[in-house]
Design a protein with these regions (language model features):
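Positively charged, solvent-exposed patches that mediate nucleic-acid binding
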Residues: 1-114
Length: 114
């Protein structure tokens, strides 16, 4: 279990959005694109539509921790962008909900090893 390598540049996000595959769940969207290296990289976003900065940063922290928990079960050599989606209810997704949705998206994109 290594460190998380982040995607930081806007052009890399745009390349993954344009050329990558994606899957959507209720609270998250995951985009993926092969990077042909021996590591996975991740970018996490939450638009201003999601809420104020406190709310956006909290959901990004939850996504990051859940990704850290499942990263050993993912195939190697991909760039991922995970987008927090605004839910229709007033209830914010909790740790377990995000964990279930990340696993669902990984299965849908066929990137789970186990």
């Amino acid at each position: 279990m290594g460190d998380i390598i982040k995607i930081k540049e806007n052009r890399e996000f745009q390349r993954i959005y344009r050329k990558g595959r994606y899957a959507v769940s209720r609270a998250l969207a995951m985009y993926m694109l092969p990077n042909y290296s021996q590591v996975n990289r991740i970018g996490i976003t939450a638009s201003k539509k999601y809420g104020k900065s406190v709310k956006r940063n909290r959901i990004k922290r939850l996504i990051k921790e859940n990704y850290r928990a499942i990263q050993d079960n993912l195939k190697i050599g991909y760039d991922f962008v995970i987008v927090a989606r605004k839910t229709d209810g007033s209830v914010e997704p909790d740790f377990n909900t995000i964990h279930k949705e990340l696993n669902y998206l990984a299965k849908k994109l066929n990137i789970l090893v186990r």
